[in-house]
């Protein structure tokens, strides 16, 4: 029979292991999105989320467009070896140009905690503005979510809900020719996750840069 001390040690070790796993998961959070990649070998594809330390080999003529989620820096890189790092990429043997664009970090209205509290009221009625987590400057967002299906329901107008297949955790409304109404409020649902977004009244149509229309549910 196990002694009380042995059980305490086992419990402590289990707690320590869970803590280490949580830290590792946090460290492995995506910090960038690969908007486009051409002429490069490897496993990476368009709209992949990238973590610190990820490497992309572009060879001599391959190219990639990478958007950084926190800094809103968008890079166009030709050739070389790219290593994902906080804020911007490290590029060896290639050419890179950078610009700052509108992105999720500048579009968020509510923090995740505030959005969670807002969701508990089940979005019962207006004003919808108080439930909005993100204002999106594009009519066709790129939604990343867990699950197999995304439901899009307009809150401020009587319209049929739209259901979109999630492929690899992504639903690109631009690729599906789905445009949401500028100024409209929409509830996004995937599995047990929900959030409310507002489409900016001046939102642009079409496939804008991915990081400018990215919504992470």
Predicted regions and their residues:
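Aromatic sugar-binding surface patches on proteins
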Residues: 167-176
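Edge beta-strands of extracellular beta-sandwich domains
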Residues: 71-75, 193-213
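Short, solvent-exposed mixed-charge patches
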Residues: 215-217
